[in-house]
């Protein structure tokens, strides 16, 4: 009992650091952007109205939508948009057109994650460093250089892994939440009447009295829910109960106290609007607060970078991106990975955002469109999961998701007003990633169609080969094939040039599924083809670690014993040649050919021993 309690406490502390770091640092800029826009005059009723909108936005979007509803839609314990997409796709698998539409929508939502992933670290770290301007205006010219140095250090340490320092994320973020709660409480005690803003009638009254202004400021209010998607994305790491405990026990109370404390400060000192968060603190605490805020924003950014690695790996295994280089940074935790291309690609985009927009206020204009569209997509996918996956009545499904869809649409529509102020930037990044993903998926489909059309039947081919069998050599040959039942090009090349066949021959197909995990008991399918030849299908979920030698070791005792020292892996390295035809648009064919050329080798991706791999090339026109 004591052990389970300590485990729950540890998971809850971990969730505070990883899940809520992003939303916890939104206090740095959310209130400033709403009141600093100039759309809202400083009157008591307006301040009460805005604070009420903040509180009920957190309640409806985070507490009710994500913590209560969306967390229930887990995919074998896993969360995130990719897991939700797989769940929705499986729920409507008997409706091919609807399934195709949902897959496109879900992949677009996943692409937008990268757009959001550029803005969030930029605005978080920049807003933390901007606290130096409150200490002294002379520090203003150093804000951007310091921000860039902090970001560079953050991305430079990724290849070393974060296992060692990761244990401090929870405690540091807990100190952050305690600090912002105390800052807010100190000002609330001076103006306790500010707590009347908890009543929803203040939010409704403000909206009815100022419909136009309300619609405009929703684009800034959305800043208070930055990182809400992380609640669901990190479900597999922590579980539902720790995430819910961390939200209702720590994050939500601390955020509420701080936002209301900032409101109390603005009522007393309207001039504090230039940076209400830092101006809540006494002068002696400013420098320590800037340091703590920087640490908190770095932790929030770290969680997003780790999420980008994880999502990219999942998308690759679902077949929407080519294989990329993956390095494991921990021998104990296979989930801790480093992807150089993703890491430095994100860094370049974030630096570009900081240099282009130059302040957290300007970046706030860029934030919102991508994340609110992602929220709307999550709501849409949730509807299809509970309607077709869980089989709930249509009326109940509409009631459960309809109100959230209306809220998401309102926030999205408001953020569209910021399209030309900077909202185009994350949309552009998301659009580029989406084009890459869809081009790769369609290119692979066309490539497989071409390979199947040209392929010989494996059983017929082996039957003809063994009518006049070639010389057999000791050892095992493993031939990787895209689909079962077809002769791999590597086998044809081997017979043509070497004129030998190994004593044992395995024709292996790796099949990735739209489910997060597939256990060892369902890992292998094996079919004997005679003459010590086998057709092997290896099944993986999109979160499983692909390790071919380890999977093939499971064949022991099933008629096929593999000795690692005498096993060779034969791979086909295809060169794609774009042609004018009925495939994709010419620019997409050229893009696919380039992506295919630059893809990481299958040997590294499948953990094959480099000294046992033989690659044989061929050219394929699409």
UniProtKB/Swiss-Prot annotation:
It catalyses: K(+)(in) + H(+)(in) = K(+)(out) + H(+)(out). It is found in: Cell inner membrane. It comes from the Bacteria. The keyword Transport applies. One of its GO terms (cellular component) is plasma membrane. The chain crosses the membrane at residues 8-28, 50-70, 103-123, 137-157, 168-188, 203-223, 247-267, 285-305, 337-357, 366-386, 393-413, 419-439. Keywords: Cell inner membrane, Cell membrane, Ion transport, Membrane, Potassium, Potassium transport, Symport, Transmembrane, Transmembrane helix, Transport. Its main location: membrane. GO terms for molecular function: potassium ion transmembrane transporter activity; symporter activity. It is a multi-pass membrane protein. Belongs to the HAK/KUP transporter (TC 2.A.72) family. HAMAP family: Kup (MF_01522). Transport of potassium into the cell. Likely operates as a K(+):H(+) symporter. This is Probable potassium transport system protein Kup. The gene is kup.
């Amino acid at each position: 009992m004591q052990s389970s309690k300590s485990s729950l406490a540890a998971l809850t502390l971990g969730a505070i650091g990883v899940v809520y770091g992003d939303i916890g640092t939104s206090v740095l800029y959310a209130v400033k952007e709403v009141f600093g826009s100039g759309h809202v005059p400083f009157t008591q009723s307006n301040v009460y109205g805005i604070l009420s909108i903040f509180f009920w936005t957190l309640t409806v979007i985070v507490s009710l939508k994500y913590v209560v509803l969306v967390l229930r839609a887990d995919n074998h314990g896993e969360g995130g948009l990719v897991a939700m997409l797989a769940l929705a796709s499986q729920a409507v698998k008997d409706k091919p057109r609807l399934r195709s539409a949902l897959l496109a929508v879900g992949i677009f939502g996943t692409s937008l994650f990268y757009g959001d992933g550029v803005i969030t670290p930029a605005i978080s770290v920049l807003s933390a460093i901007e606290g130096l301007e409150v200490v002294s205006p002379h520090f203003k010219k150093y804000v951007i250089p310091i921000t860039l140095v902090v970001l560079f250090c953050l991305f430079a340490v990724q290849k070393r892994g974060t296992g060692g320092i990761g244990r401090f994320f929870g405690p540091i973020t807990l100190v952050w939440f305690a600090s912002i709660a105390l800052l807010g409480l100190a000002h609330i005690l001076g103006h306790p009447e500010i707590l009347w803003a908890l009543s929803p009638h203040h939010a409704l009254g403000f909206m009815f009295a100022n419909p136009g202004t309300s619609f405009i400021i929703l684009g800034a209010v959305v800043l208070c829910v930055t990182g809400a998607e992380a609640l669901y994305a990190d479900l597999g790491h922590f579980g539902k109960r720790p995430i819910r405990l961390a939200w209702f026990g720590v994050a939500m109370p601390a955020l509420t106290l701080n936002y209301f404390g900032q409101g109390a400060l603005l009522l007393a000192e309207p001039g504090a609007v230039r940076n209400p968060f830092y101006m809540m603190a006494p002068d002696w605490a400013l420098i320590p607060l800037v340091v703590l805020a920087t640490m908190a924003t770095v932790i929030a950014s770290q969680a997003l970078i780790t999420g980008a690695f994880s999502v990219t790996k999942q998308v690759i295994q679902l077949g929407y991106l080519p294989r990329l280089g993956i390095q494991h940074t921990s021998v104990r935790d296979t989930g801790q990975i480093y992807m150089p291309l993703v890491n430095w690609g994100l860094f370049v985009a974030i630096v570009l955002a900081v240099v282009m927009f130059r302040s957290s206020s300007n970046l706030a204009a860029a934030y919102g469109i991508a994340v609110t569209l992602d929220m709307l997509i999550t709501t849409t996918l949730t509807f299809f999961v509970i309607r077709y996956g869980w089989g709930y009545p249509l009326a109940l499904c509409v009631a459960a998701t309809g109100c959230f869809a209306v809220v998401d649409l309102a926030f999205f529509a408001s953020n569209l007003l910021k399209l030309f102020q900077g909202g185009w930037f994350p949309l552009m990044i998301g659009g580029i990633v989406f084009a890459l993903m869809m081009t790769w998926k369609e290119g692979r489909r066309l490539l497989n169609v071409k390979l199947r059309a040209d392929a010989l039947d494996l059983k017929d081919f082996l039957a003809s080969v063994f009518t006049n069998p070639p010389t057999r050599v000791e050892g095992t040959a493993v031939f990787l094939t895209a689909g079962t039942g077809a002769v791999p090009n590597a086998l044809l090349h081997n017979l043509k040039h070497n004129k030998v066949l190994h004593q044992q021959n395995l024709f292996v197909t790796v099949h990735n599924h739209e489910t997060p995990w597939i256990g060892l008991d369902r890992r292998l399918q094996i079919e004997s083809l005679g003459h010590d030849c086998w057709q092997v299908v290896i099944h993986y979920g999109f979160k499983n670690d692909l390790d071919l030698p380890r999977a093939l070791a499971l064949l022991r005792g099933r008629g096929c014993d593999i000795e690692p020292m005498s096993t060779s892996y034969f791979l086909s390295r295809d060169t794609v040649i774009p042609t004018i035809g009925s495939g994709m648009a010419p620019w997409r064919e050229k893009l696919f050919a380039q992506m295919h050329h630059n893809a990481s080798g299958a040997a590294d991706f499948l953990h094959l021993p480099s000294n046992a791999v033989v690659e044989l090339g061929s050219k394929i026109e699409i």
